[in-house]
Regions:
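Residue-level detector of anion-binding/catalytic polar loops
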Residues: 55-56, 80, 113, 151, ...
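N-terminal pre-domain/capping segments
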Residues: 18-105, 109, 177, 181, ...
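Acidic-and-aromatic substrate-binding clefts and catalytic sites of carbohydrate-active enzymes
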Residues: 33-40, 56-69, 88-98, 122-126, ...
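Active-site acidic/histidine proton-transfer and metal-coordination neighborhood
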Residues: 93-182
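Conserved beta-strand positions in the central sheet of alpha/beta enzyme cores
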Residues: 58, 83, 115-116, 153, ...
């Protein structure tokens, strides 16, 4: 009898684990609108995202007036600004984007994250000689942001100094601030790293990730592909994006997921509708 009870308890525990829900918040990159009539209209952007079922948006750090308009438009639709796009320049006199000193206080306790791409004019990508200066800059930025409940995430980006998710994780460990983490960006990973190692690299990164971005893409020799094949509406292309989401689910990733939309040719209402329909299909399969 005791053995039967033990078996039932173990089975129930396994069933609970297997049935773990996976419903991350889903937000849209602001580049979804950059080549359209929506480009300078944050109100129209927010209304469309609300209509389609997105949880929020990423926005670029702008002037104080631009930031205020964007934040107000998003708030009016009961959406959230998940990410703020900004730059760190290792050699610049002002290494930290000065616009953040106006914007970060406005994000106080709103659950926002500033994701930074890190540039260097004198160092090649991933050159370790930049680590020490970068760590010092990031500690300063993270400490400032922490006073307002804002997080910082390191965004690997093709053409910058920080290009790989493993480097972002290593810097996160060295910076050692509770409000600083890393980003996994699918299109940049496919452009720069080995798709065959994606599961291994993503699994190692998950404990440090504050955000993930996805999009449709093609499979194959992705390092040789241009962006029109590496960034497509979700559901387009031959790359198995659902597998990426399964890896996140299996490793208990809890953060938001963003939709990369750079240089898409379709109208925003068209490609975003396609991507949202695919997202809902993915969530149904995973839950």
């Amino acid at each position: 009898m005791k053995l039967l009870l033990i078996f039932i308890c173990v089975w129930l525990s396994l069933a609970t684990i297997n049935a773990q829900s996976f419903n991350p918040k889903f937000f849209c990159f602001s580049d979804a609108f950059s080549r359209s009539e929506y480009a300078t209209d944050p109100v129209a952007q927010a209304k469309l995202l609300k209509q389609l079922g997105f949880d929020g948006i990423e926005m670029n750090a702008g002037s104080p007036e631009q930031n205020d308009k964007k934040l107000e438009a998003v708030q009016q639709q009961n959406l959230k600004v998940f990410m703020i796009w900004a730059k760190v320049d290792l050699e610049a006199k002002e290494a930290i984007d000065a616009r953040l000193y106006d914007l970060i206080p406005k994000l106080k306790d709103k659950g926002a994250t500033v994701w930074v791409h890190i540039n260097s004019k004198s160092r090649t990508p991933s050159n370790a000689t930049g680590d020490s200066i970068c760590i010092s800059i990031l500690q300063k930025l993270a400490d400032y942001a922490d006073d307002y409940g804002v997080r910082i995430a390191l965004y690997p980006h093709h053409g910058d100094w920080l290009i790989k998710v493993g480097h972002a994780v290593a810097l996160t460990q060295k910076v050692n601030r509770r409000n600083l983490g890393a980003v996994f960006n699918l299109c940049h990973y496919l452009k720069l790293e080995d798709p065959a190692q994606l599961e291994t690299e993503l699994t190692k990164a998950v404990p440090y990730l504050f955000s993930v971005s996805i999009n449709g893409a093609d499979d194959g020799e992705t390092n040789k592909m241009e962006w029109d094949r590496l960034i497509q509406p979700l559901g387009n292309g031959s790359f198995n994006v659902l597998k990426v989401l399964k890896i996140l689910q299996q490793n208990e990733y809890k953060g938001p997921i963003g939709l990369q939309c750079y240089a898409l040719k379709e109208k925003p209402q068209d490609h975003l509708t396609t991507s949202m329909a695919t997202w809902k299909k993915y969530m149904k399969k995973l839950n």
